[in-house]
């Protein structure tokens, strides 16, 4: 629940901030703050059906983006390259009891270790309205040479509120990998021969190749399920984000938490789910896709194992097309390849090749 709840919180933050950035905005109304137990159960709330916290978002965090005074940023994108300059407009929505005179607005950009890359401040009168322009903030990204998650924070001291956003910066020039695996689109004779010889194989399953009963009929999307799939007659999406171990070495060059954030948006938008219920009961994919709570299948979009004398990585994300326009997909592929070229690539589970083949159309 924590991982799907964090995605739900991210989606609520995006919706509410979009409303607050809208000219002529006159207020917002959410469907509910708590889960609705009727009509097949709608798990739409950040509180449960008894109005109790679920444990994935606190009132304090929710207030950072849903409050009478909220700092806002108009990001053109959330994934950047290190040959770009981050330059984004900062604004404020203020609907307090009275205007704020000479409000002190501070901002900073920091990495995951807390090191500040840039900071600054503005002094601004805040009338009771929204779309109040404050100024542009940002910094050059050329000093970032490794895949990095940054946090952009803005605080209005007089309003006692601080909002923040995660962004990602990836290097334009990637590390050369000398020991590339054999890349295949099916577990054919050539791929099996290489595995039997002890080689590494990366199986990139093409979009649309997964059989319907093995996940091809599951509509994957970045956002969460609305209401429930039973009541909406399988309205897409059918999933609730990803769950992974951020410390897994396959993700070492793709900074992430254990749940979805915006660096996963492109990947989730161009992937197929794989149903892994026929795999061992205790088997866990590298990147788990959280299923609809009515079906609760074991879904994956990246998994690994041993076959014969070799090692196999299977991915159902599109990591081959338009990579020059898809920096997150390009970096995710790089992270997988670096892992497969290292001594850390040593899966503990032996897979049945027929169960792998059973996932996709022949």
Question: What does each of the following model-derived ranges do?
Answer:
Residues 1-102, 283-285:
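Substrate-binding clefts and catalytic carboxylate motifs of secreted carbohydrate-active enzymes
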Residues 83-125, 132-140, 148-157:
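Beta-strand-rich binding/interaction modules
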Residues 165-186:
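Low-complexity, Pro/Ser/Thr- and charge-rich linker/hinge segments at domain boundaries
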Residues 179-228, 306-309, 315, 336-339:
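Short alpha-beta junction capping motif
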Residues 209-211, 228-327, 344-362:
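Catalytic beta-strand/loop cores that center a nucleophilic Ser/Cys/Thr
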